């Protein structure tokens, strides 16, 4: 597909072949190379391509991922293995900074998400303090064996006071696994997601990524 302008350079760099040259030669019928099974080769790197979202440039937009195309670009990341490549991609697209142990994580969203309990347990065992703004989420988290969470005051209409709350509890990143897009701008999941972006905090809202 010659229209895949971003995929062509990505695949060319990953596999070490300039496919634009190959395609051009094939079109004009000159110096067409013999077919080669590039996937049979061994490479010393792994590469992935991830979407780039522009939530910081869209004031008030809900940083919610749905089926529609919401990305405004892509980033290619390389690493020695899949995990290194993925870490590089997260850092380059979201400004993700690894939160420090014993700092706060704000959890919210759909507690029926299968991964929710696993995520909360791992974070707690790593030494993070778990916070939430919803009583149902609080009850769910505190019902997980050997996990403790605290529900905090969460001003929905006052960004300055909300910033103070984030600072007081040393909340360093937000995980919000909401199932549906927020119906309005006073929805607590929307407020958590939007202000994570506005405060420059890492936001994760996809279960597998979390």
Q: Which ranges hold each PLM region?
A:
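General beta-strand structural signal in soluble alpha/beta enzymes
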Residues: 78, 107, 130-134, 151, ...
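Short internal beta-strands
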Residues: 127-136, 140-141
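Short hydrophobic/aromatic-enriched beta-strand-loop microsegments
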Residues: 127-130, 145-157
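Buried hydrophobic positions in well-ordered alpha/beta secondary-structure cores of metabolic enzymes
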Residues: 23, 85, 140-141, 206
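Glycine-rich phosphate/diphosphate-binding loops that line cofactor/substrate pockets in enzymes
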Residues: 91-104, 123, 164-171
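Peripheral docking tails and interdomain loops at the edges
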Residues: 153-210
């Amino acid at each position: 597909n010659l229209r895949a302008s971003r995929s062509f350079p990505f695949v060319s760099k990953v596999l070490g072949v300039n496919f634009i040259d190959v395609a051009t030669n094939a079109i004009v019928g000159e110096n067409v190379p013999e077919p080669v099974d590039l996937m049979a080769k061994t490479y010393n790197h792994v590469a992935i391509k991830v979407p780039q979202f522009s939530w910081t440039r869209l004031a008030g937009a809900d940083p919610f991922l749905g089926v529609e195309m919401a990305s405004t670009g892509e980033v290619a990341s390389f690493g020695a293995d899949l995990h290194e490549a993925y870490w590089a991609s997260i850092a380059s697209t979201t400004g993700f900074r690894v939160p420090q142990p014993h700092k706060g994580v704000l959890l919210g969203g759909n507690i029926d998400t299968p991964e929710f309990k696993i995520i909360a347990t791992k974070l707690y065992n790593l030494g993070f303090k778990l916070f939430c703004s919803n009583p149902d989420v609080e009850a769910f988290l505190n019902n997980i064996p050997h996990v403790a969470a605290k529900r905090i005051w969460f001003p929905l209409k006052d960004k300055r006071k909300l910033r103070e709350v984030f600072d007081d509890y040393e909340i360093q990143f937000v995980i919000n696994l909401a199932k549906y897009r927020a119906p309005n701008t006073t929805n607590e999941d929307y407020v958590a997601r939007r202000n994570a972006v506005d405060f420059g905090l890492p936001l994760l809202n996809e279960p597998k990524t979390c």
